[in-house]
Amino acid sequence: MNEHASPSETLRTALTALLDGLPPKQAAGAVERLIENYRGTTPTHTPVLRDQADATAYAAYRMPATFEAVRAALTALADTAPDWTPAGHTDVGGGTGAATWAVTATWPGSRPVTVLDWADPALALGREIAA
């Protein structure tokens, strides 16, 4: 992550760059399919995020909101326990890593991080965004 920009700004910049590399029709198709999956019956036999286009579309339309929601919750926790800082972070079902960005925004500094998800494209994209 860029040490001179806030995690929120760095995330926004990374997502913009990712979208610049995805053809608009491909992004629109992926977003539409993802919306249908989330509004309908989500298949449980295979990851919803099947490929790079799906992961990018998901990151573009969901990651900022997820980041802000998790950051708000973590900020409340930090305000309640100001002397506590996590020694590490594990995110089960973490996808592209929005919660990890929220942890960094709330408690700056390095710590061990593990993000687990069955959608390899989401994990790969999360690593790319963080690089």
Positions of the model-derived regions?
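Conserved SAM-binding loop of SAM-dependent methyltransferases across substrates and taxa
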Residues: 96-109
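Conserved SAM-binding loop
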Residues: 126-127
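Conserved SAM-binding strand-loop segment of SAM-dependent methyltransferases
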Residues: 131
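Class I SAM-dependent methyltransferase Rossmann-like catalytic core
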Residues: 46-73, 77
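Short beta-strand element of Class I
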Residues: 111-114
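N-terminal auxiliary segments of SAM/dcSAM-dependent transferases
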Residues: 1-45
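Conserved class I S-adenosyl-L-methionine
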Residues: 85-95
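Conserved SAM/SAH-binding beta-strand->alpha-helix loop
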Residues: 119
